[in-house]
Curated annotation (Swiss-Prot):
CDD domains: PBP2_EcHMBS_like. This is Porphobilinogen deaminase. The porphobilinogen subunits are added to the dipyrromethane group. The gene is hemC. It comes from Helicobacter pylori (strain P12). It catalyses: 4 porphobilinogen + H2O = hydroxymethylbilane + 4 NH4(+). Keywords: Porphyrin biosynthesis, Transferase.
Length: 306
């Protein structure tokens, strides 16, 4: 039998992730594999903010099409990019152990967010980050920052931005210091995206190795990520809208924190729930109900106009 084919985007970070799964497949499942690079819509359109491109699955759709055709056997994604509703026949075979979930401030001149001058230009790909930055500093000029990690850092170093915000996990995976000043926000300061820090391996549910890939699943991370995805699903949300949600486990207790609002930070809902792990999905439903009662749907409709 030939090697399994792993579909991956072509960025340095995406290939690190694909190679990480390739190595684990060989070591833990005794399966040989090879990587096929696939360009997605989100990779091709680099001159437009992600929220303006439209549609869900900007970094996953082309990979899913190849899975359905049988051209590739599995697709490795940053879990935060994976839509919460799958194409028929597809699902996540595993969710890997989470890396650092935090967002990180990077700057050449300024040590932290509060030291930025009034009206400073901050680059981010994410409306979620923009919203939470504006909550802290309404004066900031948050602008779209596209490209891979190295491209974004070059834009910072060239003076296009006073600071940029990146995912800590990506910096750690690529072993990048990033800039003179680097400071991670706590989860309380900036609630991450659903699934941030974890990888999701997507396959056909009837693939003969689907069950085998579950050996790579991290139970604790998968549990928390599925809670986050359930919350997003309840709001009919995706990864390009201003919602942050983070679930964490401490023994038999679970905490779910969420934030949702306009990208300008002017209408924002922030809530959290704590409870027993056995009631975790009930807690998600309670949290959803509170968000909906607080006007979440209306805020998300307004957010589409930004």
């Amino acid at each position: 039998m030939g090697n399994l084919v792993i579909g991956s985007r072509g960025s340095e970070l995406a290939l690190w992730q694909a190679n990480h799964i390739k190595e684990r497949l060989k070591k833990e499942c005794l399966i040989e594999s090879e990587i096929q690079i696939v360009k997605t819509k989100g990779d091709k359109i680099l001159d437009t903010p992600l929220n303006k491109i439209g549609g869900k699955g900007l970094f996953t759709k082309e990979l899913e099409e190849l899975l359905l055709k049988g051209t590739i056997d599995l697709a490795v994604h940053s879990l935060k990019d994976v839509p919460v509703v799958f194409e028929k026949g597809l699902d996540l075979a595993c969710i890997t152990k989470r890396a650092d979930v935090r967002d990180t401030f990077l700057s050449v001149k300024f040590p932290d967010l509060m030291s930025l001058p009034k009206g400073a230009k901050v680059g981010t790909t994410s409306l979620r980050r923009s919203m939470q930055l504006k909550l802290k500093r309404q004066d900031l000029d948050t602008e779209s920052l596209r490209g891979n990690v190295q491209t974004r850092l070059k834009k910072l170093e060239c003076g296009e931005f006073d600071a940029i915000i990146l995912a800590e996990a990506g910096l750690c995976r690529l072993e990048i210091q990033g800039a003179k000043y680097r400071k991670a926000f706590s989860v309380k300061e900036m609630i991450p995206s659903m699934g941030q820090g974890a990888l999701g391996v997507e396959m056909l549910k009837n693939h003969k190795h689907f069950a085998t890939l579950q050996k790579l699943n991290d139970e604790k991370s998968a549990f928390c990520c599925r809670l986050e995805r359930e919350f997003i699903k309840g709001l009919n949300g995706g990864c390009q809208i201003p919602i942050g949600v983070h679930a964490s486990l401490m023994g038999d207790r679970v905490k779910i924190q969420a934030v949702l609002g306009l990208p300008n930070g002017k209408e924002v809902i922030t809530k959290e729930k704590r409870g027993d792990k056995t009631k975790a999905f009930d807690l998600v439903q309670e949290l959803l109900e509170e968000f909906l009662q607080s006007g979440a749907k209306e805020i998300l409709e307004k957010a589409q106009l930004f």
